[in-house]
């Protein structure tokens, strides 16, 4: 990831919206900048990652069926860039909207294992309901 120069508010996608395979999104976080760990960055970091199909992510050479409809995969088939330890909970922003939340993975930046994100659009109704309750 490289340093991120500004922070802004990003809206959520509509219920059930999805980004097509190959769409390039941006993940941001304060986590480790290398798979081996090491010192955490002193600035917010960001990386551009393409959306990976559920079929590829669920292949026997990757997550072998463990990816559900509530998840999004993103990363390069060559590896090299990814969210990593300490980035969990951070946003995956696509077209200016928070489509994913950093969830889990197998190592970091491994070409066989894209990063796994919670699919925000699958929970949009719940987010709206909770927001309405909080405003009462």
Language-model features and meaning:
Residues 1-136:
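Extracellular "complement/coagulation-type" protease architecture
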């Amino acid at each position: 990831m490289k340093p991120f120069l500004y922070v802004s508010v990003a809206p959520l996608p509509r219920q059930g919206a999805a980004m097509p395979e190959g769409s390039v999104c941006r993940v941001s976080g304060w986590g480790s900048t290398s798979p081996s760990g090491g010192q955490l960055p002193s600035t917010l970091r960001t990386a551009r990652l393409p959306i990976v199909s559920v079929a590829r992510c669920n292949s026997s050479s990757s997550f072998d069926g463990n990816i559900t409809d509530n998840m999004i995969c993103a990363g390069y088939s060559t590896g090299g860039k990814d969210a990593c330890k300490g980035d969990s909970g951070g946003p995956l922003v696509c077209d200016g909207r928070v489509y994913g939340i950093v969830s889990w993975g197998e190592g970091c930046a491994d070409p066989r294992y894209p990063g796994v994100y919670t699919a925000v659009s699958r929970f949009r109704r719940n987010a709206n309901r909770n927001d309405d309750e909080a405003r009462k």
